[in-house]
Each structure stands twice: as C-alpha cells, then as structure tokens.
Curated annotation (Swiss-Prot):
Signal peptide segment: 1-20
Protein name per Swiss-Prot or TrEMBL: Apolipoprotein C-III
Annotated source species: Panthera tigris altaica (Siberian tiger)
Family assignment from sequence similarity: Belongs to the apolipoprotein C3 family.
Compartment(s) of residence: Secreted
Site (May interact with the LDL receptor): K41
The protein's role, per its UniProt record: Component of triglyceride-rich very low density lipoproteins (VLDL) and high density lipoproteins (HDL) in plasma. Plays a multifaceted role in triglyceride homeostasis. Intracellularly, promotes hepatic very low density lipoprotein 1 (VLDL1) assembly and secretion; extracellularly, attenuates hydrolysis and clearance of triglyceride-rich lipoproteins (TRLs). Impairs the lipolysis of TRLs by inhibiting lipoprotein lipase and the hepatic uptake of TRLs by remnant receptors.
GO biological process per UniProt: cholesterol efflux; cholesterol homeostasis; chylomicron remnant clearance; G protein-coupled receptor signaling pathway; high-density lipoprotein particle remodeling; lipoprotein metabolic process; negative regulation of cholesterol import; negative regulation of fatty acid biosynthetic process
GO MF annotations, alphabetized: high-density lipoprotein particle receptor binding; lipase inhibitor activity; phospholipid binding
Amino acid sequence: MQSRVLLVTALLVLLASARATEGEDPSLLGLMQGYVQHATKTAQDTLTTMREFPVAQQARDWVTGRFSSLKDYWSTLTGKFSGFWDSTFAVTPTPASEAK
C-alpha cells in the first residue's frame, strides 16, 4: 500500500512540475522577445549615430568616388574590347561567295 501511495505522490509531483514548467515558457518567450526588441533598437540607434559622424560621411564619399572611377574604367575597357571584337567578327566574303 505504501508503494502505491509513494508512486501516486511521485506522479503528482511530476505533473505539478510539468505544469510549473509550462507556466515559465511564455514568460521566457516574452523575455527573449523583449531582449531582441531592445537589441534591435540599440543597433538602429547606433547605426543612426554612426551616419551622423563626419568620418562616416567622408568614407561614403570616398567609396562613391572610387566606385564611379571603377565604372568609368570599366566602360573604357569594354569600349576598347567591344571595338576589337566587332572588327574581329566582321563578315568577310569567302572565295566561294565571290565566284558566284
């Protein structure tokens, strides 16, 4: 009889602890959501602050200038090669077509 009472008591304790664990999950989820929202806001604030620094503006201007220079170089290079390819693949009459 005592073993049955002990078994029932153990099952009730397990059931009660399972219920207690279920109660903690939503609060843990809420805690994690709050943490993620706080981290997101902090990151956005930091990026906004970084955009306001003169050094960041200088870096953006430098990158924009270098990218523009690279685009100019690329268009010059492709212009030279496109002329080369156009002249190479020009249609030249073959001796058989001249004989007709």
